[in-house]
Amino acid sequence: MPDEIKCDVAIAGGGLAGGLIALALAEVRPELDVRLIESTPGIGGNHIWSFFDSDIEPGARWLVEPLICHHWSNYDVAFPSHRRTLQTGYNSIESERLDAAVRAKLGPDRIVAAQVSMIGSEIELSDGRTIAAGTIIDARGPADLSCLDLGWQKFLGQKLRIRGGHGLVRPIVMDATVLQNDGYRFIYCLPFDAETVFVEDTYYSDSPTLEVEALRQRIVAYAQLRGWQIEAVEREETGVLPVAMGGNFASYWSSGGSVAKAG
């Protein structure tokens, strides 16, 4: 194993942003030696990402099209006093699909399974190796969030198998008919097949604390309200996402160093 790796582009962080950058470069600049550095076993982690058809320009659709696991031509929203079906396409990507696509496109030699210990003009890895690249992109996540005034979007989602089927024919992107706990709250449902549905309890709050067990119980209660009998929980993911409302943005960007940022 060489002590120094040389390449054209080094991407620190194999989440959604880092994975998409790697895929895009491999497609449009295949002559470049691109390395993706990620210490965890799976590119993209454990996530389901969703987007509306209108979120991505037609000319950029080629990048995400192979990653789409589920597509629906419309979706529902529900509030205490009204509900609607909106005629816009909706899509979901499972992180396992991103992982497989990145590994197939880059090949095993260009994915560096190591922890980044320092990033600057070059990347230092925790195992003692260094990466010297013409371009370095830091896609490992946020810098010093204390520079910003933040709220938080918090969620827990579970992929459920429902005995006898769930009866949904399209996503419920926002069901705000539920009890409002600790801030604005809604339930999100993605019907993957007749018996499988991803249910996520999402809410906005002033606190980053996530009460995992409470959210699990809320999903159970929501399933019971719909008359669903949960046969199995096939996956679970959680998230606490910062929502910037103000602060010192110049200090925030400086806190992350001078390397190009993504994600």
Question: Which residues fall in each region the model found?
Answer:
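Short beta-strand to alpha-helix junction loop
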Residues: R84-A104, A139-R140, D206-A214
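Short acidic-glycine loop/turn motifs at beta-strand connectors
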Residues: A78-R83, F192-E195
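Predominantly flavin-linked oxidoreductase catalytic cores and closely associated redox partners
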Residues: A24, D109-V233, G247-S251
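N-terminal Rossmann-like FAD-binding beta1-loop-alpha1 element of flavoenzymes
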Residues: P2-L36
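Structural motif
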Residues: D8-V9, T135, S258
